From Swiss-Prot:
The lineage of its organism: Bacteria, Pseudomonadati, Spirochaetota, Spirochaetia, Leptospirales. Pathway: Metabolic intermediate biosynthesis; chorismate biosynthesis; chorismate from D-erythrose 4-phosphate and phosphoenolpyruvate: step 6/7. NCBIfam families: aroA (TIGR01356). The keyword Nucleus does not apply. Keywords: Amino-acid biosynthesis, Aromatic amino acid biosynthesis, Cytoplasm, Transferase. GO terms for cellular component: cytoplasm. It is an enzyme of class 2 (transferase). This is 3-phosphoshikimate 1-carboxyvinyltransferase.
Length: 440
């Protein structure tokens, strides 16, 4: 087995606010006439870019203190066309959800763009159903990618059966229907995250739930603003969960984490591998389940990850793969082709980096696998422990960079990650917090 070297300080930590909820708080604040307030807002590049975009549409923004903002909107029907392109940077959630909202606003003309990574990500998955609602939206890049040119108009009611389990597609269409005061019937084959539905209900709206995978919404919609409290992001906590369960000693108590049932797949996956993680102080805040997570040093083993779990762990698969390297029996992920449409092609990026480390990895169209028997893992670790400056490519992807920083900490290997600035898109202060957990 790979020897456990990392000793942690037993301490409480907090991670930044949930990125998904931070984006959505801005969108609902813009839709709602009057004042809204958000605490726990993630002050990272992605949600701040969404905030900046809607400020250009007429949303007034005032920062009260770190993580706390007050918004004032003239109401969705009095938002204005921006005089510059709306730049979402690397925020796929921001551009897709905002596109839906803006499509349903008659008289608003806007071009939504982003960085080179975002311009490669698929937008046809929202363009097609939005167009069926009567939206005027065109992907100006190759293969219907960003920039997105939108001319807002009154949309028609729509029934959509999504071929993929995607909270972004679902939320995009919901926001289009809400902004245009029309009805939407939506169904999917596997349950995706329901943050938009929860925030929508929290504001006083009703959803007709036909089945767990099938719902309807219809006007009139309640859009009077509210006070949102954003919990810590479980996708960010995942890095410290893996650090905690693979440490030689020490316990981490990660406070105030969002435990939405559609997001806790990382807990299910890690616990099925033998991770000891305890949920404490579980409660409901602003329509979302929240709690504290305590980690204990654990011995991990290979576990089969079912297809039904993939949508709820899609962002955590890179760090879960790192845990797999330390697990007896290895690691396999399948039915995860959505990884190829993230900030990078995460199947390719993880496979290529693991191969750079000398790990024999089998790549599939929908995932990858590697053998984690004690002998092979130990041989790889023994060889690498004598190598200096092992190159790791982040591929402009924050989760790849953070995953291999955790790998570096746990393994003690001299990994040289090409660029870590991408981490700022979701987790400012990550490296400093990581260093503070280590007991030298």
């Amino acid at each position: 087995m790979i020897p456990k070297k990392t000793k942690l300080k037993s301490r409480e930590i907090e991670v930044p606010g949930d990125k998904s909820l931070s984006h959505r708080s801005v969108l609902f604040a813009a839709l709602s006439k009057g004042k809204s307030k958000v605490t726990g807002f993630l002050e990272a590049e992605d949600p701040l870019n969404t905030m900046s975009a809607f400020a250009k549409l007429g949303l007034k923004v005032q920062k009260v203190k770190p993580g706390e903002y007050e918004f004032e909107s003239p109401g969705k029907n009095k938002l204005v066309s921006p005089n510059v392109d709306l730049d979402f940077g690397n925020a796929g959630t921001g551009i897709r959800l905002s596109a839906g909202l803006i499509c349903g606003l008659p008289g608003i003309n806007a071009t939504l763009t982003g960085d080179n990574s975002l311009k490669k990500r698929p937008m046809g998955r929202i363009i097609k159903p939005l167009s069926s609602m009567g939206a005027s939206i065109v992907g100006l890049g190759e293969k219907e990618t960003a920039p997105l040119k939108i001319e807002g108009k009154k949309l028609k009611g729509f029934r959509y059966e999504s071929p993929i389990a995607s909270a972004q597609v679902k939320s995009c269409l919901m926001l289009a229907a809400i902004s245009s005061e029309t009805d939407l019937e939506y169904s999917e084959n596997i349950l995706s995250r329901d943050h938009t539905e929860n925030m929508f209900r929290f504001l006083g709206n009703k959803i007709e739930q036909i089945s767990p995978l099938h719902f309807k919404i219809k006007p009139p919609y309640v859009l009077n603003g509210g006070e949102f409290r954003v919990p810590g992001d479980i996708s960010s906590a995942a890095f410290f969960l893996v650090l905690g369960v693979l440490a030689k000693e020490g316990n981490l108590l990660i406070k105030n984490i969002g435990l939405n049932p559609a997001r806790t797949g990382i807990l299910t996956a890690l616990q099925s591998m033998g991770a000891k993680i305890e949920i404490q102080n579980k409660r409901i805040e602003c329509g979302e389940t929240v709690g504290d997570l305590k980690t204990y040093p654990s011995n991990l083993k290979k576990s089969n990850i079912p297809e039904s779990l993939i949508p709820s762990i899609i962002d955590e698969i890179p760090i879960l793969s790192v845990a797999g390297f330390f697990a007896e029996g290895g690691f396999e992920i399948r039915h995860a082709e959505e990884l190829r449409a993230k900030e990078s092609d995460r199947i390719h990026t993880m496979v290529s980096n693991f191969r750079e480390l000398g790990i024999e990895v089998e790549e599939y169209t929908d995932g990858y696998s590697f053998d984690g028997t004690s002998k092979k893992s130990s041989e790889v670790w023994t060889r690498l422990s004598t190598v200096k400056k092992i190159p790791i490519q982040s591929y402009m992807d924050h989760r790849i960079a953070m995953s291999f920083l955790i790998f570096k900490t746990l393994s003690g290997l001299d990994l040289q990650i090409d660029e870590t600035s991408w981490i700022e898109t979701s987790f400012p202060g990550f490296e400093k917090l990581l260093e503070s957990c280590i007991n030298e």
